[in-house]
């Protein structure tokens, strides 16, 4: 019974830590300066003129990309892989926080089962 209480408490702590780190990331993103606030606004306007004619859309999973902003979905990242000595960046779905929590629970349960034997 005590072991179950310890496991549940540790799971709650892990979930709390994971949610607080996401809140810190959101806070940091809110504090970043916008384009209008930067000193190099003229450079950004030139970039907009050049790329203004391009129609932008998101890139699907497992297609090549340059940065995270191009990939479709909230938990999709532009991750680099090395193939034959060349770096290839592909959009990959990382699954988000829920997938990580479920994976942690699965590992915990398997460790408990192995301890009982």
UniProtKB/Swiss-Prot annotation:
Organism: Cyriopagopus hainanus (Chinese bird spider)
Family recorded in the similarity comment: Belongs to the neurotoxin 03 (Tx2) family. 02 subfamily. HNTX-XV sub-subfamily.
Location within or outside the cell: Secreted
Comp. bias (Basic and acidic residues): 23-55
Name the record gives this protein: Hainantoxin-XV-4
Region (Disordered): 20-55
Function summary: Putative ion channel inhibitor.
Superkingdom, natural source: Eukaryota
Molecular function terms from GO: ion channel regulator activity; toxin activity
Residue numbers covered by the propeptide annotation in the UniProt entry: 21-56
Domain-level remarks: The presence of a 'disulfide through disulfide knot' structurally defines this protein as a knottin.
Keywords linked to the UniProt accession: Disulfide bond, Ion channel impairing toxin, Knottin, Secreted, Signal, Toxin
